[in-house]
Amino acid sequence: MKSISIIGAGPAGIEAASVLARQGFAVTLFEKSSSVMKNVADKAFLFPDFTAAADIVEEMNKKLLNSNITQRLDTDIVNLAREDNNVWKLTDAKGNSYYSDLVLVATGYTPFDAHRKEELGYGIYGGVVTSLEMEKMIRYDQIVNSMGERPRRVAFLQ
């Protein structure tokens, strides 16, 4: 059985793991955080139809219920190298090594640093937050400004 390592347990990584496991591959899914779908799980609702993020996370977790999938959470892959025998060597931040016939990198995205757009006031004015920060506040019902107070007014800029 061919082995494949997938780096990243977000939507793309999980979908790939599910499809490849059903095709008979031995899949190892690496995720640097302590849970899969972390970026999605921190949101309340998803665009464009406002589906609850928790529902999507639950559905994606079901796709991992396959004996051909091994999850390695809290495992930050920091190096990837091709060995002489055409096997891939993956090394994590703790120095542990893993070997695989194939590798798929599905590491997701990095949110835009709003500090780079000074004209929006992020980091300058206490009440300015990004849409991702607002999503997280809504998700965990902790809508507060930088002083820890619940805002009296909210405005959205696009």
Predicted segments — roles?
Residues 100-113:
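Glycine-/small-residue-rich beta->alpha transition segments that form the dinucleotide
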Residues 24, 68, 100-101, 125, ...:
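Short, well-ordered alpha-helix to beta-strand connector turns
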Residues 112-151, 156:
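FAD-site-proximal beta/loop scaffold in flavoenzymes
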Residues 2-67, 155-158:
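Beta1-alpha1 glycine-rich phosphate/pyrophosphate-binding loop at the start
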Residues 64-78:
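A conserved beta-strand/loop element that lines the FAD pocket in flavoprotein oxidoreductases
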Residues 81-97:
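Conserved beta-strand-loop-beta-strand element in the redox core of flavoprotein oxidoreductases
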Residues 28, 70-72, 129:
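General small-molecule cofactor/ligand-binding pocket signal
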Residues 73-75, 92, 130:
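Short loop/edge segments at beta-strand edges and connector loops
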